[in-house]
């Protein structure tokens, strides 16, 4: 069994179910403004780089005109920085953090800052920071897709072509 298959076997059906449920929950959350922070951290990216970037973004967030949105973004960023202090380095597959002011009732002012941290089933390939009215879950959804390898062979009387299809990627 190869090492990638061994790593994948660690993600049993219960973990996969819980992560799919969390992705579904996060996908249904929308903020009142650009109050929801998404951070994807690759496995070899130093945590202090991400902390520095987020502190810089917190300074930039002070320019947001709406008091409520500014406070929510700054609170989410500071909560994310505090959460990252729990790690000396990213986990083996990287880390994905979702944090923001999530509405608990109807109307503005009912939001509560919540944070969700995920160690994905596959290595995070991108370094991403987004502050938006929704969480950026597409990359995490892609990691959850089945990635069986399919070989495709096309024969003609004069030529032949071979390709490999892995998930939704063609080589």
What would you call each of these model-derived segments?
Residues 1-143, 149:
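Non-catalytic, solvent-exposed interaction/assembly segments
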Residues 146-170:
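Gly/Thr-rich phosphate-binding beta-strand-loop-beta motif of the actin/hexokinase/Hsp70
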């Amino acid at each position: 069994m190869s090492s990638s298959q061994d790593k994948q076997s660690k993600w049993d059906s219960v973990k996969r179910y819980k992560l799919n449920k969390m992705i579904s929950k996060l996908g249904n959350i929308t903020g009142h403004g650009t109050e929801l922070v998404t951070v994807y951290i690759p496995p070899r990216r130093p945590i202090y780089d991400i902390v520095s970037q987020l502190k810089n973004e917190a300074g930039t967030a002070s320019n947001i005109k709406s008091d409520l949105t500014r406070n929510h973004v700054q609170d989410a960023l500071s909560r994310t920085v505090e959460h990252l202090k729990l790690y000396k380095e990213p986990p083996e597959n990287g880390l994905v953090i979702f944090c923001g002011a999530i509405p608990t009732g109807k109307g503005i002012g009912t939001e509560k800052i919540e944070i969700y941290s995920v160690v994905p089933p596959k290595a995070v390939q991108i370094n991403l920071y987004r502050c938006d009215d929704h969480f950026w879950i597409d990359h995490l959804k892609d990691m959850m897709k089945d990635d069986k390898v399919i070989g495709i062979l096309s024969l003609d009387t004069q030529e032949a072509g071979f390709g490999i299809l892995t998930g939704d990627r063609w080589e």
